[in-house]
UniProtKB/Swiss-Prot annotation:
Function comment: This enzyme is involved in nucleotide metabolism: it produces dUMP, the immediate precursor of thymidine nucleotides and it decreases the intracellular concentration of dUTP so that uracil cannot be incorporated into DNA.
Protein's recorded name: Deoxyuridine 5'-triphosphate nucleotidohydrolase
A Gene Ontology molecular function term of the record: magnesium ion binding
Cofactor(s) of this protein: Mg(2+)
One GO BP: dUMP biosynthetic process
């Protein structure tokens, strides 16, 4: 039995024997394909019962180290392919400890993994700190939050169209003000 099969079997028992693509009111199962260079790494899991994000790990070769100099960015493989259910996305977010202690964060945050994407999840990291930062195999480099997606129907309206029976009011309490218009305190 592969690492992935064992994890899915354990996960299914913990999720009341849900099939890999099922959901109930409490759980959505995320089938994860583990690529060859990701074999042996821990699958994403929640660190605590209240965690929103699943930790993602660097799937570098055993002897490989990626050194990010200040200001440098790199695309780090995770060795994982997510098989998301339609109606969900995976948001890629930085880990707060890496950001605070080392200035390491994700670019394009939150990054969106669409439900129909079937390529490897890779993390675009940047070093905003003052010192070099080394990334090695198995290091927790980011987190992913699985979230529902609402797709909308887009319709064009005329600037003076105010028929509230067809479209929401365009008279917002802020008007067109933005970028700090509500204050700085």
């Amino acid at each position: 039995m592969s690492h992935l099969q064992a994890h899915m079997q354990r996960n299914n028992k913990e999720s009341h024997s849900l099939s890999p693509f099922s959901q109930d009111s409490q759980h959505v199962t995320l089938p994860v394909e583990c690529l060859e260079h990701g074999q042996g790494l821990e699958l994403p899991h929640y660190a605590t019962s209240g965690s929103a994000g699943l930790d993602l790990r660097a799937a570098l070769a055993e002897e490989e180290t990626v050194v990010l100099a200040p200001g440098q960015r790199a695309l780090i493989p995770t060795g994982l392919v997510f098989h998301l259910l339609p109606g969900f996305e995976a948001q890629i977010r930085p880990r707060s400890g890496l950001a605070l202690k080392h200035g390491i964060t994700c670019l394009n945050t939150p990054g969106t993994i669409d439900s129909d994407y079937r390529g490897e999840i890779k993390i675009l990291l940047i070093n905003l700190g003052q010192e070099n930062f080394s990334i090695q195999r198995g290091m927790r480099i980011a987190q992913t939050v699985i979230a529902p997606v609402v797709q909308v129907n887009v319709c064009a309206i005329e600037p003076d169209q105010k028929d509230s029976s067809q479209t929401p009011s365009n008279e917002g309490s802020r008007g067109a003000d933005g970028f700090g218009s509500t204050g700085h305190d």
